[in-house]
Design a protein with these regions (language model features):
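Short N-terminal segments immediately surrounding and downstream of signal-peptide cleavage
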Residues: 24-40
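Small-residue helix/turn framework positions
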Residues: 130, 136-139
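Short beta-strand segments and strand-loop junctions that repeat across beta-rich extracellular domains
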Residues: 36-52
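C-terminal interaction modules
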Residues: 2-9, 17-29, 50-56, 69, ...
Length: 257
């Protein structure tokens, strides 16, 4: 199954078990199934300024924000089909979470503001269901795969890194028009822009210059792509996972067994 991952403005959602949400037609909830350390939730239905502690078995829905503390981590599930792990100091926003039944996820849109996530997405119907993840630099599309995504916005050089452990992810700096761009597989030729895109940097109103080059990459098993400022590809290719925290690539903890 194809998986759609949107990387362009990612914020993290953490929910408290004691928090109740009123669900409209089709809205579904996710749940916190593992927690080590601190997890905070900012509920869309209450004040947007106050973070509240979230615990194991807390639920969340669209519009919520989740944030892990220092030396903390959490695992979320969505309709028992997909799971998302949050590394320490990660913030995720749940922008949209819609289902057609108790165990049927139809649409999920998440945004990673800062930090790192690992996710395994299952149970989506090709051409019907949508799972998107975005950061401030790019967007990706997914269906039936395992991947990790990190976003670093602090400092002079913002960066988004996508790693695919198995399956296939399509990522673009113009996720709203993926179906119009010519795709290039990582490890092949460099990313291409759409035939209709404007060549080279273009001056626009204001003090800065922007590039209108647009690209779409296909990232497969054990490949990664790093995106820098302006949505430009910094590097792409295979990666060595020996330094990756085993839990952030799908391994179980002793307490999980």
């Amino acid at each position: 199954m194809p998986v759609k991952l949107l990387l362009a403005g990612f914020s993290m959602l953490l929910l408290a078990a004691s928090t109740l949400h009123s669900e409209g037609p089709g809205q579904v909830r996710g749940r916190v199934v593992f927690l080590e350390g601190d997890l905070s939730l900012r509920n869309a239905e209450t004040t947007r300024s106050a973070w509240q502690p979230a615990g194991l078995d807390s639920s969340f829905s669209q519009g919520d924000l989740l944030r892990t503390g220092r030396s903390s981590r959490a695992e979320l599930t969505i309709q028992q089909q997909s799971r998302i792990r949050l590394a320490p100091e990660t913030q995720l926003e749940v922008q949209r979470l819609i289902g057609e039944g108790e165990d049927d996820l139809a649409e999920a849109r998440l945004h990673l503001d800062e930090g790192e996530i690992w996710a395994e997405v299952n149970g989506l119907d090709e051409g019907e269901d949508l799972f998107e993840i975005s950061s401030d630099l790019a967007g990706a599309a997914i269906t039936g795969t395992a991947f990790s995504l990190s976003s670093r916005q602090g400092g002079a050089e913002p960066e988004t890194r996508l790693r695919v452990w198995h399956g296939e992810v399509r990522i673009s700096n113009a996720p709203w028009k993926m179906d119009q761009l010519e795709a290039t597989e990582v490890g092949k030729a460099g990313p291409r822009k759409a035939p209709s895109s404007v060549k080279g940097p273009q001056s626009v109103a204001g003090p800065k210059s922007v590039s209108l080059d647009e690209w779409l990459l296909i990232v497969k098993d054990m490949q990664e792509v790093v995106i820098g400022a302006g949505g430009q590809v910094v590097s792409q290719g295979s990666f060595n996972d020996t330094e990756t925290d085993p839990w952030m690539k799908g391994a179980s903890l002793p307490s999980d067994k």
